[in-house]
Structures are given as structure tokens and as C-alpha cells.
Amino acid sequence: MLNVLFGDPNERRINPYKQIVNKINYLEAKLKKLTDSELQEQTERFIKLLSNNSSNEELLPEIYATVREASLRVLGLRHFDVQLIGGLILNDGKIAEMKTGEGKTLVALLPTYLNALAGFGVHVVTVNDYLARRDSEWVGQVHKFLGLTVGLIQEGMSQFERRENYLKDVTYATNSELGFDYLRDNMAIDLEDIVQRPFYFCVIDEVDSILIDEARTPLIISGPGNSPVNKYIKANVISQDLIKDIDYEIDEKARNVILTDNGILKCENLLGNTDIFNLQDPWAPYIFNAIKAKELFLENIHYIIRNQEIVIVDEFTGRIMSGRRWSDGLHQAIEAKESVPIQSETQTLASITYQNFFLLYPKLSGMTGTAKTEETELDRIYGLEVNCVPTHKIMQRVDFPDLIYKTQYSKWKSIADECLDMHNLGRPVLIGTTSVEKSELLSSLLKEYGVPHNLLNAKPENVQREAEIVAQAGRLGAVTIATNMAGRGTDILLGGNTSYMARTALIDLLHVNDASTISTDIATNVDFLKLKTFIQTKLDIETFINDPQCNLKLGLACEKSFTNDEQIITLRAVYQVLIEYYEKLLSPEKLRVQSLGGLHVIGTERHESRRIDNQLRGRAGRQGDPGSSRFFLSLDDNLLRIFNGDKIAKIMDQLQIDEDLPIESKLLNSSLESAQKKVEAYYYDARKQLFDYDEVLNYQRQAIYFERRKILETNNLRSWILQYAETTIEQYIEDYFSKEANNLEACLANIEFLLGLNNFFDVIYCSTLNRNDLKQFIIQQLYIAYDLKESQIDLIETGLMRELERSFLLQKIDSSWKEHLQQITILRESIGWRGYGQKDPLIEYKNEAFNLFVNMVSKIRQSVVYLVFRSQPILKN
């Protein structure tokens, strides 16, 4: 009704952009007349105009028109009007919701080029290394064509490589690499160790995945800590003796466990009448984690075991998270459960949440196919407005109502039946599962049915073929099982992805990869053999495949960017022949798949978040293609079991519905959506609470990191140490004069101890001085003592005092910050109990965290001054 009266609010937000798009379109004919070199000269012209105070808004239509023309010449892809709208939304620091297949990667070119002209560096963030490399090599060619430099950050890169790539105009990286580099930079002991520039503008691809799904997991750099391995083993043994619903209760919504009185007594008896809550030797955290490991964290669902290690599986993407560990002893508890080596518990050296990390960017924007359901959170926490970009073609996908079965058996049997029917029909099917275990269960069923299929989950043997499997999931009769959204970022094209097949064939012709996926085609097809002969006459293949630039050149060969490189020109000619071959080969197949109804997506369980369900559905019906989706559910599914599953079961029993027959009802769909909204609200509250608490630490983090950076950037830190000493001395004197039972002798003794002096001050003389005169007198002595200490140390080696100052400052800041993080963690874990005393835990946390921080800063000052004045370097012979 409101939409009828006032119009669609999203449409109102989009309308102003349409006027700018008209201006961009008007400039298209003019730019088409420019030669390549004239088009490339536009960049230098824009930079000069911007440096002469021309505004981005004035130049924006021409800048976007230039990028569109460059994209057409380099990639053969021209931005549609809706893609221009997406680019305008991003430039305004908002989130552009664009459906799957609408060309988000191409859209990001527009704002990244415009903002890179300022010279401060732009970051394009993706969810994995593969997508970062793909985008930098593909659309990065447009930036290079226009004269900008393109960088890429990948796992395993050296410090030098990282610094060089961050200096580029546009840098592609994953969210985790960016975050960890930021933390490492703020642990650096030399300016040369810092790799990042100050942040400027950032575009996040799959922004909902990074800012919502990963917001609960902070980035942590850890060091070795003390962990009693025997406690994890003993707690695991005890947990096996405890009985669910008698000794402990499970809160599945909160993913938490609660020990009953009976359970506490049982644990204490098993431990020899030990109080499990004893603060000096606590057992409770170990037992709680052991029960969580037993009940809430399951192999092939939440983790896999690889090389005797527990590897986390991302519950949202189905990908393995190498190098990541659960904190607070949970990972060790799972290691004890699975009888694999228990790694030492670590101590946090530096940490930050993605929420606070991305808020460091003065200008932030993002793209995704699914953000509307989370727009409240994105606005409240990040200040990011969500705008929905219209699709280029009308969406044709049909989303069928869910089918709900009484048992898991009935559900999986029906899914397998549907896969068989679709396969026999020739229609491609994509089945999304929620875990490794369930993907393998369905795979076993399909094998029994004789249905050929591809399996993609977190297991290493499947991950290696990820892009290939997803790219070919639209082939005639293809059946693909994928865990959640593994493979996200690679489009499923009806009839098959010809460009992917052509590139794979080119790689096979060069023998770049040992394992060929289409080697039979190549071996038996005369045209392919002719192409191989052609390559051999033009290239030294062995030299080429050993060239470090091999992959980059292959990427360039598969694009349309200008090049003088003879090797790339040769490979591009072969690639074009392969493209034409596969397009001709697959064109009838594409038409056939379209006529059958396109890709059919099957969901095997409703996720806790509607977004994840929408992402799965969004694989079908891209760019106006036909498609459909359907979810098959069971009353045993987690979401239904936790929320209202028993009520639906009663209805099915009352109606005497057979186990093999499903319920299909819009009312039930609404009930499920309501359950999902409850879960989403719960997790939003958890993320908001995390943000509120981490914001307190964030202010402290920024203060410490600012101080550290200034220390690294300052050549002479003498004034720094003296300022620390003055502040400490002034505090001692203030304390002396403010106390009723003042003790001047004790005050002077503290100052003498701080400065490494023995019986230096005359108490009788000092007692005759007023507050200000006493300060001036002691600070005067401080400067004399410091000059003497500097002369003494510089006798050993000229300039040694400066090195000691920096070393002591960084050493004490880092060690104190590490201890502070530990204290903050303990405070955070215990503060919740204040709520039972009618106190607001957050306010209590803020007050106590502030006091801890003030004490830490005071301790740093005192310790640094003490170390400098007590240092006694030894003269070398």
C-alpha cells in the first residue's frame, strides 16, 4: 500500500543515477572516435584536472564513459546501463545488490578507476585468493590499458612483494590478507617492515559474506602460550561419562552448554572432590569445551581431519579455513576428542574484528547478490545503505514452495529421485548441501541410482577442481553437488562455460598441468593436433611453461587487451580458435538446456540465514536465463528441530500424512521464514554485542597503534622518554601533595628509584619548596641525569642511546599490550555475571577496561624510563 502511495523507495534512490547514466551515454560516441593512445591519455588529463581542484562529480560522467570504452576495447565487454548504476552506487560509498551473473566484477572497474586517480591507492577485496588473482588478471587489464598500476596480494608473498603490490594504484586482495597485514604492520619494529599505505577507498565483493558472516570471528595474531595438555585429555574423558539432559543441557540456539547440579557433582567426584570453579586451578572451562566438542562440533560438518590436524570448515561457504583455529581452548578440546596431537594454546598478540577493520577506510562500498535482508545491520554498524540494482534482463527463475518430509530418509530419497528425473530429462541440476557429510551421503545415493555427478566440498581432492566443476554445472544432464556456496564467483552458464573450456584446452595443449581434464578430446581431434603443431612452431613450450610469468601470459592470451608480446599473440590466436570451436560445439546444447527450463537448484536444508538460501537460488536464472529452485526439508533438519518442528510434526500426524509424502504449503514457508528471522535477529544481536564490546577495545587499539607509528617515524626519541619521565614524576608529586598523610621521603625515594639514583635528593631542602618549585627542581635534575646517561652510553657506540630508546619503547608497548589483551579477554568473559547484580555489563566493561588501559599506559611510561636509566651497556674489548 505504501509503495502505491509513495512509490518504491529503492526506485526513488535509483532515479538520480539514471540522469548521470544519460550523460555517460551521451559521451559514448565522442570517445569511440578516439584512438587507443588518445583514450589512454585521458588518465593523465583526469589526474591534472583533479589536482587543479576539479571535482569528481564534474568529471564522473566522462571518467565512467572512458572506462566503459576501455573495457569494450580490452575485454570486449561494454557496461550496460544498470552496471553503470551499480558503479555510481559504489562510488557513493554504498552497497550495490546485484543478482548473480549481472557482472559485479565489471562494475567494480568504474569506481576503482575513478578513486585511484587520486593516487592514494584503492583496495578491491574478494573472499579467496583465486578470485583476487582472477580479477586482477582479468579486469585489471583495463586499468593497465588506461595507465594505472595493478597489484595483487596472495598468501605466502614476501614482505617486499606485499609492499610493492600495496603501492600500486589498484590492489586486489582477500579480506584476511588485508587484515593480517594491518595487524603485522602495527607490530613492526622498523618502518621498512610496514607494507600498507594509509587506507583510502575499498570495494568489497560479496560484502555480506565478509561484513556479516565473518564478523563474529576476529582476526588474531597469536604467540606461544601455556596450555596444560593433560587437562584437555582428562576433560574429554570426563565428558564421555556425562549424560545429556541429566548432567548437562544443550542450548543449540546459542551453541552453548550448561552443567546441571548433578553434572557439577559428578565432575567434581571424577576429579577427586576438586572444585571445578576454583579460580586458582579452574576445570570448568575445559569441561565446558569438552562437552561442546562432543555435542556441537562434528567431523565433516564443522571441521575435517587432514594430516592429523583439525581444519575448520566455514559454515557459510563450505570452504576449509586453513590456518584458522577456534579460540579459548575449544580447538584443543576438539583435538583431544579426535585423538590428534593437541597444539599449544596461544596468547593473543594482536587482534581486530572485521567490523572495526573495515571502518578504518574513509570510504567503503560493496557488492553482493544478497544484502537486502541484512540492510538494517549494514546501515547501523557500517553506515552502508543498500541499493538494489535492476537486472539487465527480466528474471525468469521460478522458486517453488518447499517440500517438507517427516524423516531424513524420505527427504534424501526424494532428492535423489528428483536428481534422477532431471538427469534423464537432460536438465542440469545443482544441489546445495550444508556439510561435507551430507554431500557425501547424497553422492552415495546417486551412485546407487547410477546418476553420474560431480562432488564439490571442503575435502582437498574436491577443492582442486572447484572452478572447473562449477563452470560446467550448466551442461546438458550435469548433476553437481556443492557444499553451501563453494565455487561462488564462477558463473554457471547454460550449456557450459566456453571460455573456461577454451582456456583449459589451451593449458592442456601446453601441458601446463599434469592432470588433463579433456586430454581425450585433444588426443583424438585432428584440429587440436594442428593447433599443437602451430604452437610448437611458434613457441619453445618447455621454456614458456617454466617462465614465472606463464600464468599471467595465459590470462592475457584469453583476453582482448593490447599487447606486443609475441608469445601472448600466438596463444591468443589459438585461444580464439578454441573459443569458436566450443561455441559451435555447445551452442545447440545451450538451446536444448534453455528449452528444458535451465538450471534447477535443489536446497537440501534451510540455512539459519535467508541470504545463504538466496545465494543458492541465485545460481539459477542468471541474466534472464530460465531456471528454477526448490528446497527439500525434513522435520529433523536443525532449523525445524530447534524452531517449531514438533508443531509441524503434530499437524502431519493429525492429517495422517505418509512418511514418503511431503507437505507443500505457503503457510509453512512463512513459518520457516519467521524461524530464520528469529535466528538472524539472534545472530545480529550477537554481532552487535561483539561490536559494542570491541569498540571499547578499538579506541584503545587506535591509541596504541598511533603511538607506535609515531615512535617508528621519529628519529630522535629523547623528548619522548623525557616526556614519559616528566609525566611520571608529576604524578608522584601530585600524589604527595594531594594526600593528607603525605610522605616526602617516600615520594623522593620513588623518583630516585625511577631514575636510578641513590640518596640523591635532600629531603630537608625539598620540603621547603612549593609544588611548582619542587616539580621544576626535580625535572631540572632529570634532564641533567639524562644527559649524563646519554654520554655514558654513547661512549660505547655513537648513537646507541637512540637505538636503546626505540627498542625499550617498542618492547614495553608490545609486551604491555599483550598482557592488556589477556586481561581484557578475562574481563570480557566474566563481566556478564554483573547483569545478575542489576548492573549493565557493557557500562561496567567500559569503566573497567578504561581503568585497565590507564594503568597500562602508566606502567609503560614508568617501565620505559626505568629501563633507560638502569641500562648498563658493556664496553666491548
UniProtKB/Swiss-Prot annotation:
**GO CC annotations?**
chloroplast stroma; chloroplast thylakoid membrane; cytosol; plasma membrane
Family, per the entry? Belongs to the SecA family.
- Whether Nucleotide-binding counts among this entry's keywords is yes
PANTHER family under this entry?
A: CHLOROPLAST PROTEIN-TRANSPORTING ATPASE, SECA INNER MEMBRANE COMPONENT OF SEC PROTEIN SECRETION SYSTEM
PROSITE patterns, from UniProt?
A: SECA (PS01312), SECA_MOTOR_DEAD (PS51196)
* Name of the protein: Protein translocase subunit SecA
Q: Which InterPro entries match?
A: Helicase_ATP-bd (IPR014001), P-loop_NTPase (IPR027417), SecA (IPR000185), SecA_CS (IPR020937), SecA_DEAD (IPR011115), SecA_motor_DEAD (IPR014018), SecA_preprotein_X-link_dom (IPR011130), SecA_SF2_C (IPR044722)
Recorded name of the encoding gene: secA
Q: Name one GO biological process term.
A: protein import
- Organism in which the protein naturally occurs: Guillardia theta (Cryptophyte)
